C-alpha cells in the first residue's frame, strides 16, 4: 500500500484495491441519484467512495464519499483500513510535529491540472457535472473544493497563502458565490482587498489529493501554510503545487482535476443560499461575495469530486473530525501539558470531549475555558465535556459513565451566555451568538489546604508614625 497520494486518482485506485470504492457504470440522473448515493454510502459502516461513470446530460464523471468512513480516512494516512480512530488521532499528532515541509513547485508542463485550458466562452456546466445536493438548496453547489487566496497586504508572503474549504454556489456559467463567514481567513483577506477597492484574486481547485482536501478543512493559524502541513502529514514528502496562470502569488495543487481562476469584485454582494449544511439543517440565505471565473484549466476527462451534507454522520463529519481534534489538542497541550487527548469529531467541533489530569480543584473547567478561547473553539465549540485522564474521550460509553458518576449538576455544569457562535447552527439565535456549556466530569480534586480561620493582617508597628513622617517630608 502506498503511503502518499499525489492526486485524487491515485487515492481512488487504492480505495478500489482495498474494496473501499464502488463504480456505477450505468447512466444515472444528477438529481437525486448522486446525493442519494452519498447519503446511502454514509449510512453503511466503513462506507465506500462511489464513482459514477456516466451522468445524464454531462460529459464527465463524479465521485462522492471519498473521505466518508474511518476505513477511507485510515487509507488516506497510509494506514491499514481497520486502524482504530484513536490510533489515527495519535498518528496525525505525531506527523503534525513535522510541520513545515516546503512544497515542491512543478513547472506548468509537469502539472496534470494544466493539461487543458479554457479562456473563452467559459461554461462551468460543460466542465463540472453540477447538481443540487439537497432538494431545497438555492442551486448547484460545489461543496468540496480547495479555495486558494492570498493576503492583499502581503501577497508574496507564502505563509499567508490560504487554502480553505468554503461552500460555493454556482450562479451562472462563469459566476459563483462563496460563503465567507467573519471568522474565516478568506473573509479577513477579502476585507483587506475591499478596503482598497481592489479585485481579490482567487483560484478554486476541485478534486484534489486527499490530504490537500483534509488540510483545506483544518483550523490552523493564519500564518501557517496548508501545503506545508500536507507535506508534514505525508510524513515529510512534499506536496506538489504549481503557480496559477493568472496570479504570480497563488499556487494550486498540481494534481487537481479542475482549477477555476478569477476574482472577487470588491463590495459586490448577492444573496447566497439556502443550503443544506453540516449541522443537518438548511442554513438560510445571506448576502455573500461573488467570483467571476475568467480561466479554467483541467485534466483530461476530469473527475468532479463533491460531498453530501446532511444529518450526521456524512462524509463531511469524517473529513472535519480528527483535523479539528488535533490542532485543538496541540493548542491546549502547549498551555496545559496535563491534557491527554481531544475528541472534537462532533459537528465540526461544536461538541468537544477532553481528557486531562487535574492538577488542582477546578482544573477541568479551566481546560474547557481555554478551549473556548482558541481560534476554532471560540466560534464553533458549544458543548465541552472534560473527563479524567484514564477515560477515553473516543469511547462514548466511558464518557457517559464519567458524566453519570462524576457530575454534580449544581457545581460541575457551567452555562456561559452571549458568546461568539457558529451562525450555521440552527440554535444560534441571533445567528452568530451562542450560549456555551461546560460539563466537568472529572474526579474532584481537593483545594489547597487551609485549616485556619481567616486572620486579618494588622499594619506593622509604627505605621502611623511613618505615615506622618512621609507626609511631613512631602510637605502635605
Located regions from the model:
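Extended, highly charged
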Residues: 1-275, 280-290, 294-476
